[in-house]
Amino acid sequence: NMKRTGFFACGDELVQQLYENIIWGQRGNFLDIPTDCNQRDERLGWTGDIQVFARTATINYRADKFLKKWLHDLACEQRENGAITDVVPDLFNWETVGSSAWGDAGVVVPYWVYRTYGDTQVIKDQFESMKKWILFMESKGSERGLFDTHDCHFGDWLSLDAGDEATGGMTDNDLIGSAYLIYSNRLFIEMGKAIGEDMSYFEELYDLSIKAYRKK
């Protein structure tokens, strides 16, 4: 029962059809949880999919209640070490979790709920979960500021530059991991400041991450 809030119209039939497909794709995948696809039996709440779609989702529909409920589930599934599961709900209880871009849904989704609707309550609700995820990434680095020693990254998933049979692209997984540490930490700092939290530790980490990333 989400209210439609975003509309688009243009004179190009193909562009217009693409937009309509996006709307129907969201409608088909926003049933109780944000799923990855509704046309096959898997239908799991893959965190990576909503991470990249959250901004669009919050523009198309009034999706804050839907996403905040799912974020509560995400925090409940989060491992003690801060790793975020690759699917929420975590139906399979996989041992290897915490992939960059997938786990970053725990920061990126609250960010777009906050930015689109001006909702600071989502920051307060998810603050500890977001903090645990940032600290988890920090703990998995060859030096402080990198996220490059974790052994579970999907990387540039389904990119075609590595050939038709490959599931991941040619971009180094650790490069993507460290880039997402920088990205999510920047969003986390902005949100923390919005609710009056002291973010000095994470600002220092952000500066170190930039330097370490450029050096590597």
Annotate the PLM regions:
Residues D90-G98:
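Aromatic/His-enriched, Gly/Pro-containing loop or helix-boundary segments
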Residues M2-N21, R27-G28, P34-V52, T56-D86, ...:
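Active-site acid/base region of carbohydrate-active enzymes
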Residues T85, I182-Y183:
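Structured core elements
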